[in-house]
Design a protein with these regions (language model features):
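Ubiquitin-like/PB1-type beta-grasp interaction modules and other compact soluble beta-rich domains
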Residues: 1-83
Length: 84
């Protein structure tokens, strides 16, 4: 099981702040997880439709979409950050 945490409009579109899920064995990266999540229903598809722009963190450390998620306890998703 891994805890998925959602922030900002990702959270608003899904309607959850977090959830614990058992990942399929073939989901090995952030990109794979985003693709899998997008298949879980209309709300998830809407939240992850801009998959390439969504940022992620594995166990509170920013991660690229190619990062392996094996052994992760928590994966967070949030929109791109801006600021000065």
């Amino acid at each position: 099981m891994v805890r998925l945490v959602y922030f900002a409009w990702v959270r608003e579109r899904i309607g959850l702040t977090q959830e614990d899920v058992a990942l399929p064995a073939d989901v090995l990266t952030i990109a794979g997880l985003i693709a899998w999540l997008a298949t879980r229903g209309e709300a998830y598809a809407h939240a992850f439709e801009a998959g390439a722009s969504i940022r992620a963190a594995i166990d509170k450390t920013h991660a690229k979409h190619g990062a392996l998620i094996t052994g992760a306890r928590e994966i967070a998703f949030f929109p791109p950050m801006t600021g000065g």
